[in-house]
Design a protein with these regions (language model features):
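Short loop segments and helix-boundary regions at transmembrane helix junctions
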Residues: 1-7, 11, 48-52, 109-110, ...
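Membrane-helix/interface signature in polytopic inner-membrane proteins
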Residues: 43-82
């Protein structure tokens, strides 16, 4: 693992913003990582809901062939989407490195299941074209509360993975049921 990060990187993971300027009697703090997540959420909500590119992303997720037939440059939009995913992964990695004060390459190795479950809980479809930034945000919050609760109840990581996998399977069963 790589260690010895600068104070700026540590600030992303451990930094706090003092809120006494709001006139609060007690000293209240807001984590920098929470502020950063809120800023990213607002930017991406605007991007996905108020821009043409955001609408194209939904169209490509729903049916890439129809999107291509309607004149959308699918390959260009996919490059943009994958670039944004890489950028957001980098932000997440910086926050994680700041929290742990180390850059371990396998640190997020088991996070894929949580990410998929958060998206599914938030209403995103396995089949594309559906889902919202707000829904995914809600799914992430629910997953965080679920993980925290399971950790507080001292549930082993194996059974946590089983539970989260079951949530995904149940959502697939629910999606595939005829209406």
């Amino acid at each position: 693992p790589i260690s010895g990060f600068t104070d700026e990187v540590r600030y992303l993971g451990h930094g706090r913003i003092d809120l006494t300027w709001l006139g609060l009697e007690k000293s209240q703090y807001l984590p920098v990582s929470l502020v950063l997540i809120a800023i990213v959420y607002i930017i991406f909500w605007i991007f996905m809901n108020k821009t043409r590119t955001g609408k194209w992303i939904y169209a490509i997720g729903g049916n890439p062939n129809a999107a291509r037939a309607s004149g959308i440059n699918v390959n260009k939009i996919l490059v943009i989407v994958y670039s944004l995913c890489g950028f957001l992964s980098g932000i997440g990695a910086l926050i994680l490195a700041g929290r742990t004060d180390s850059g371990y390459p396998n640190a997020g190795l088991q996070s894929e299941l949580d990410a998929i479950a958060a998206c599914i809980i938030g209403g995103a479809s396995f089949f594309g074209g559906r889902g919202t930034v707000l829904g995914v945000f809600a799914g992430v919050m629910i997953m965080g509360i679920l993980r925290n609760g399971l950790n507080l109840m001292d549930v082993s990581s194996f059974w946590q993975q089983v539970l989260i996998g079951s949530i995904i399977v149940l959502s697939l069963i629910h999606i595939s049921e005829p209406t």
